[in-house]
Amino acid sequence: PAMARGMIKPLVSFYIGGMGTYYHAMFCRYGWEANANEVRDLYNAGKRKEAAAAVADDLIDAIAICGPADHCRAKLQEWRAAGVGTALMNLPTGAPFEMAAQLLRTMAP
């Protein structure tokens, strides 16, 4: 999970620090105010790598499913049972088509 979290943290830091105030305010409302403020401040200071590294693991775990396939399938099933109807799946930029196809096959219900 740590490697997978590391892959999504830059995107989350962009949402918090680089997309206006909406997502920053949302994370503040959801209980991550201190972390959102730290990430936003680092991001806006041009410290993008530091901002990404500062995104809390528990924040990532609350909004994303990261880790080995068995763990991801189990978490996705938990989310479905909780009422989540649509999940977005992200791959690293430039990932080959076959990687995307394999992800979809692996995560299919």
Model feature map: region roles:
Residues 1-109:
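Active-site-adjacent structural elements that line small-molecule/cofactor binding pockets in enzymes
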